[in-house]
């Protein structure tokens, strides 16, 4: 078999290489054209969207006509839903107003003792009070009495810490007003005979309808009663409900 010449073998090798190069070139050109077309399409769509947004901004909305309220179409489509929404909004506003009024009506007064006075002729010891917590103007402490300025339902609480060897001690909380005097509540405690152990507290509480002008007093039905003047041992308080 005759041997091939060197020139013929070189031409055969160069022809496939040239074909590959041509295919790669055409592929690159085709890819570039495709990218350019895609960019043109995207640019066209973007310009179209910008024109649409500009038109909507000038017209005020996609379907809003001149003089038409924004909620009109929704009202026409689902009036029951909007009616329920309006009712809920009104209910929330009413609750907010009632809450504000309710908060304004609250009065609080907490009193602690500053001194005691004893009336030997009536066998009574009275406590002189001072406020340590006060909110509102419905109540006012005046010496040994508390005056009610605002009619309403009140939580009333009272405690006296005794240090006395008298066999029984207690407190009486009374109201005077509208031409009569009445006892709201009373508390009685037995006392130890040993002076070192003669401590006992008397606590009472209740809910009462107090009227403007009522006078509230706390009395210990013993002359020269011995009791604690500490704010955590003896106190008197009112909370309007």
UniProtKB/Swiss-Prot annotation:
Propiece residue ranges: 1-95
Gene Ontology molecular function terms on file: cytokine activity; tumor necrosis factor receptor binding
Residues annotated as domain THD: 107-241
GO biological process: germinal center formation; immunoglobulin mediated immune response; positive regulation of cell population proliferation; positive regulation of germinal center formation; positive regulation of isotype switching to IgA isotypes; regulation of immune response
Reported modifications of this chain: The soluble form derives from the membrane form by proteolytic processing.
Disulphide-bonded residues: 187-202
GO CC term (a single one): external side of plasma membrane
Record: glycosylation sites: 115
Miscellaneous information on this protein: Transgenic mice develop lymphoid tumors that originate from expansion of the peritoneal B-1 B-cell population. Aging transgenic mice develop progressive hyperplasia in mesenteric lymph nodes and Peyer patches, disorganization of affected lymphoid tissues, mucosal and capsular infiltration, and eventual tumor cell infiltration into non-lymphoid tissues such as kidney and liver.
Family that this chain belongs to: Belongs to the tumor necrosis factor family.
Protein name: Tumor necrosis factor ligand superfamily member 13
Organism this protein belongs to: Mus musculus
């Amino acid at each position: 078999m005759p041997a091939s010449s060197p020139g013929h073998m070189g031409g055969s090798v160069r022809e496939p290489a040239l074909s590959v190069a041509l295919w790669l070139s055409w592929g690159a050109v085709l890819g570039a054209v495709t990218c350019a077309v895609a960019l043109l399409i995207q640019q066209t769509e973007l310009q179209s969207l910008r024109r649409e947004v500009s038109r909507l901004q000038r017209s005020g909305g996609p379907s809003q006509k001149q003089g038409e309220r924004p909620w009109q179409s929704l009202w026409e489509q689902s009036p029951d839903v909007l009616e329920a929404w309006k009712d809920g909004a009104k209910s929330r506003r009413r609750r907010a107003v009632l809450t504000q009024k309710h908060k304004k009506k609250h009065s609080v007064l907490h009193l602690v003792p500053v001194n005691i006075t004893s009336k030997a002729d009536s066998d009574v010891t009275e406590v002189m009070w001072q406020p340590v917590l006060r909110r509102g103007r419905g109540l006012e402490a005046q010496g040994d009495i508390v005056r009610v300025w605002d009619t309403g339902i009140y939580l009333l609480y009272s405690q006296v810490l005794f240090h006395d060897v008298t066999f029984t001690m207690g407190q009486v909380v009374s109201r005077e007003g509208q031409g009569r005097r009445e006892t709201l509540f009373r508390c009685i405690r037995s006392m130890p005979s040993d002076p070192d152990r003669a401590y006992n507290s008397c606590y009472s509480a209740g809910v009462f309808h107090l009227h403007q002008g009522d006078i509230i007093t706390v009395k210990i039905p013993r002359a020269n009663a011995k009791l604690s003047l500490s704010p955590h041992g003896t106190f008197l308080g009112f909370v309007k409900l």
